[in-house]
Amino acid sequence: WNRPFVSIYEPSTKKEPSAIQSVSYFDAEGAGLEDFAGICVKSKNGRIDHIFSLSDAAQTATYQGMKVKADYAVISNEYAGNRTLFLGNGTQLVAPGVMIQTDNAANVLLEKKEGKWYIISSAPCTVVIGDKKIKSDASSEHILLRI
């Protein structure tokens, strides 16, 4: 199987019911994108995740101001002072107020937790948050970004 796909798994019980409010699909904007899968997951706590899956990390998918050049990416909105952005085997992720760029395909997790930004990256990368540009080395542990 070499087509892009996205699956949503969420264990839940009667004591811990589902946190997902809705799941919808979206298509990348523009022409020329061969294989793409896009899912929008809305959670009951206000978090919204846009999940991008491409068959070719050299291609670029755009949707509502978001831009991804990767095999896989997750872009969340900001909710309760938190936000998650993940670039999977890619070189670029652009979202409102944030940009991640690498020279070579990498995995980058950029998280905002209680108002503070943290990063884990498999390769050196450049991150732009608002008007602040930060260069980050590869790290397997969370690094606090000084913003």
Where is each model-derived feature located?
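Non-catalytic terminal regions with compositionally biased, polar/charged low complexity
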Residues: 1-3, 10-147
